[in-house]
């Protein structure tokens, strides 16, 4: 499939450089199998010139730098990138990479292999090979081929045109109603939560066969409730909601091929980072990418795995 890789930058050139350096170790980037697009948000604090300098100095091949003339905010920036690459440019799938994730050299090979595998199932949505799984390298090595359902953060993932076409009506409605003509940080949280509650009144759809069709005990609503004061209202939350309502499952490898280092940022502090379990990440370097995959729904004790949106 024709594949685009989208990176996202706003300030923090040191973060962006660390991410970009790791992206350059992926074979698909160096041999031109994928096209890399750098989306740089604008406005005060954007440091676009510094980010451009990082990109040019890195030597990592790229197709285009998309520098926004104003500050779109995270929501419009991510929705816009998906629109431009999947709707306008016609890519079959895209990989989204934020500026605070470090990739193993096996990252893209593993992710695209998983995407190919997942495309045989009509009820799989996004796929990712970043996860939080504690354990030593020796203890995790046997499980590189295992995948599981997830509701974790959308730090980096692969989205196909097929899935985007299914979920984009909800995202475009959210964008039009709540993100235009105002800063993303001042989006109307209560109105968005009302929108989410209205959406959740609809039962999830059932995609046609063939399906992965997980047992009901393994499936968890990312938003079993929408508290008025605390429910997340980000575009990531709406993306997760849209996939749930479409009957699409998010999946991840059990063992991670990337490391999230965003301890400080727009939505994160060291305390939140620890609360989310990110300190339990292992950062192991793998020599080979899995070529076959096996879904697991239970842990080693026979208990159902669970994952909630966080």
What do these predicted ranges mean?
Residues 1-97, 101-310:
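Peripheral/terminal regions associated with large enzymatic or DNA-binding modules
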